[in-house]
Swiss-Prot record:
It holds the Pfam family PRiA4_ORF3. This is Uncharacterized protein y4hQ. Keywords: Plasmid. It comes from the Bacteria. The lineage of its organism: Bacteria, Pseudomonadati, Pseudomonadota, Alphaproteobacteria, Hyphomicrobiales. To A.rhizogenes plasmid pRia4B ORF-3 in virA region. InterPro entries: MM3350-like_sf, Plasmid_pRiA4b_Orf3-like.
């Protein structure tokens, strides 16, 4: 089989302005590593649990205390999950408390040429801060930050730590560096194994 890469469009659901990323990853990437790519590309801090949902099948980190949980994402590739479920699009849930749901669409598959590491192609919109309270908390956060007369403006500004937060602007260079750093880390590990 010829190695291939896949372009994914990742959209954070239930937020405005739109938060979207386009990434390229090896089709054989383990879902646990895809989670890491999404964390870097979105700007999340990998502080919470996650789960991929393909049709009615969940992939994440199993918890023995919960019995029937998700299939172990560390043992399943994106390719095998897609083949097994027939999914062409799927969901990625991050932070079960805040409930950040992402819609992921497989846009295109290409033969791998050269590097097979993850790449960030496009970034639109600023990822919400961690622990802001999900889509509804984020909406309130943006309203309070934008309005100096808002009763929670000062508190939100202090919590955010920045007065120049722009929900519409993605810091592409910072996000791209985070994805590139992952690719470099994984390449070093692969070289050490050979």
């Amino acid at each position: 089989m010829v190695a291939s890469v896949v372009r994914l469009k990742v959209t954070l659901d239930h937020v405005e302005p739109i938060v979207m990323r386009r990434v390229v990853v090896p089709f054989t990437i383990r879902l646990s590593r895809l989670h890491e790519v999404l964390q870097a590309a979105m700007g999340w801090t990998n502080s919470h649990l996650y789960e991929f949902r393909m049709r009615d099948v969940g992939f994440g980190l199993p918890d023995e205390e919960w019995g029937d949980g998700p299939i172990d994402a560390r043992r399943v590739s994106l390719l095998s999950a897609v083949q097994d479920t027939g999914a062409k699009s799927f969901k990625y849930l991050y932070d079960f408390g805040d409930g950040w749901e992402h819609s992921i669409k497989i846009e295109r598959t290409f033969p791998a040429v050269g590097t097979e590491g993850p790449m960030l192609l496009e970034a639109t919109g600023h990822c919400p801060p961690e622990d802001v309270g999900g889509p509804w908390g984020y909406q309130e956060f943006c309203e309070a930050l934008a309005d100096p007369a808002h009763e929670r403006h000062a508190e939100t500004l202090e919590w955010c730590g920045s007065s120049d937060y722009d929900s519409a602007a993605a810091n592409f260079s910072q996000l791209n560096k985070a994805v590139d750093d992952l690719a470099a880390k994984w390449a070093r590990k692969a070289r050490r194994k050979t």
